[in-house]
Amino acid sequence: MNELLLNVVDPLHQWFLGLGDGGVLLWTVLKILLIAVPVIVTVAFYVVWERKLIGWMHVRHGPMYVGMGIFQAFADVFKLLFKEILQPSSSHKAMFIIAPLLTLAPAFAAWSVVPFDAKLVLSNANVGLLYLLAMTSLGVYGIILAGWASNSKYAFLGAMRSAAQVVSYEIAMGFALVGVMIASGSVNLSQIVFAQAGSSGFFDWFLIPLFPLFIVYWVSGVAETNRAPFDVVEGESEIVAGHMVEYSGGAFALFFLAEYANMILVSFLISIFFLGGWLSPIQGWVTADISPWVNWLWTGGWPWLLMKVFFFASAYIWFRASFPRYRYDQIMRLGWKVFIPLTIVWIAVTALMVFYGVIQKGV
């Protein structure tokens, strides 16, 4: 991977810069495509995996046609793109169209600072953690706008639920990341991973000393993405599809894409903040040099990150198939009366662990 960056990406970057302002613009467009295209393709296969896994849990087959079910999601996208986008006559026309774009843009923009390996990151920003908090907070504005612009009581009720839920759990997520920042001494995502490197393998990860914050961040991530059992925003039995009830065709597909892109993003972030990112769980236990195709098992690399992400992404599906939906008041009580006090207490505990040397990589 490093050879690819050195021999292909860097010369290509310099060539674009040599074209002047137009080259800079083209390079920016290329970087946007490098984010958007892999995310869209990953979401498509993730949807197929979700339908297959839930099918197996329900003792069904799941998708079986369109390439044995593998390309079912692509067929669904093709169908949605050619459906008519209907707008309620009483809706606010401009805001109705802007809302799904405003939801999708932050979901894509957040990926620009996510490191896949020590050298594989689009923008190795020194304030990556703060940037992520900002981007993940912006998506709710599109949801609120969709509920208001639809001029529907069901859509507006779903939007208000989403606003309250996201604000509530955003606080808990932010406090959980304060603990990560104290333990690592950095807000750079790559440096947070390096702070978990050591000769003890997974014992050096933040999962063990910050376990309560890990649970809070994981559950809050599920609530932030409005997934089961926290899916009161679009509870089918109560408010049909919530803020998306008046949307159809490509506009509905954009909301759908943003939701699943955020689910995969949260899976990446949990792996980076608490499970050592691309680090191997047995790093430092084996020092043999066999071949580059085998060494990653104990030295770490992007395959380890993808395996961790796959586990958390599959857990989203397991939650959906297993747990009943919480009531709205139960969700609010969990966020405000349990998670926020717990994170505040554990921030103090983390500071003490850093001060007394229990966590060696802190400030």
From Swiss-Prot:
<dbReference type="GO" id="GO:0045271">
    <property type="term" value="C:respiratory chain complex I"/>
</dbReference>
<feature type="transmembrane region" description="Helical">
    <location>
        <begin position="96"/>
        <end position="116"/>
    </location>
</feature>
<keyword id="KW-0997">Cell inner membrane</keyword>
<feature type="transmembrane region" description="Helical">
    <location>
        <begin position="62"/>
        <end position="82"/>
    </location>
</feature>
<dbReference type="Pfam" id="PF00146">
    <property type="entry name" value="NADHdh"/>
</dbReference>
<keyword id="KW-0874">Quinone</keyword>
<keyword id="KW-0472">Membrane</keyword>
<dbReference type="InterPro" id="IPR018086">
    <property type="entry name" value="NADH_UbQ_OxRdtase_su1_CS"/>
</dbReference>
<comment type="function">
    <text>NDH-1 shuttles electrons from NADH, via FMN and iron-sulfur (Fe-S) centers, to quinones in the respiratory chain. The immediate electron acceptor for the enzyme in this species is believed to be ubiquinone. Couples the redox reaction to proton translocation (for every two electrons transferred, four hydrogen ions are translocated across the cytoplasmic membrane), and thus conserves the redox energy in a proton gradient. This subunit may bind ubiquinone.</text>
</comment>
<keyword id="KW-0812">Transmembrane</keyword>
<feature type="transmembrane region" description="Helical">
    <location>
        <begin position="339"/>
        <end position="359"/>
    </location>
</feature>
<dbReference type="GO" id="GO:0016655">
    <property type="term" value="F:oxidoreductase activity, acting on NAD(P)H, quinone or similar compound as acceptor"/>
</dbReference>
<dbReference type="InterPro" id="IPR001694">
    <property type="entry name" value="NADH_UbQ_OxRdtase_su1/FPO"/>
</dbReference>
<protein>
    <recommendedName>
        <fullName>NADH-quinone oxidoreductase subunit H</fullName>
        <ecNumber>7.1.1.-</ecNumber>
    </recommendedName>
</protein>
<keyword id="KW-1003">Cell membrane</keyword>
<feature type="transmembrane region" description="Helical">
    <location>
        <begin position="264"/>
        <end position="286"/>
    </location>
</feature>
<comment type="subunit">
    <text>NDH-1 is composed of 14 different subunits. Subunits NuoA, H, J, K, L, M, N constitute the membrane sector of the complex.</text>
</comment>
<keyword id="KW-1133">Transmembrane helix</keyword>
<feature type="transmembrane region" description="Helical">
    <location>
        <begin position="299"/>
        <end position="319"/>
    </location>
</feature>
<dbReference type="GO" id="GO:0009060">
    <property type="term" value="P:aerobic respiration"/>
</dbReference>
<feature type="transmembrane region" description="Helical">
    <location>
        <begin position="239"/>
        <end position="257"/>
    </location>
</feature>
<keyword id="KW-0830">Ubiquinone</keyword>
<feature type="transmembrane region" description="Helical">
    <location>
        <begin position="202"/>
        <end position="222"/>
    </location>
</feature>
<keyword id="KW-0520">NAD</keyword>
<comment type="similarity">
    <text>Belongs to the complex I subunit 1 family.</text>
</comment>
<dbReference type="GO" id="GO:0005886">
    <property type="term" value="C:plasma membrane"/>
</dbReference>
<keyword id="KW-1278">Translocase</keyword>
<feature type="transmembrane region" description="Helical">
    <location>
        <begin position="29"/>
        <end position="49"/>
    </location>
</feature>
<dbReference type="GO" id="GO:0048038">
    <property type="term" value="F:quinone binding"/>
</dbReference>
<feature type="transmembrane region" description="Helical">
    <location>
        <begin position="163"/>
        <end position="183"/>
    </location>
</feature>
<feature type="transmembrane region" description="Helical">
    <location>
        <begin position="127"/>
        <end position="147"/>
    </location>
</feature>
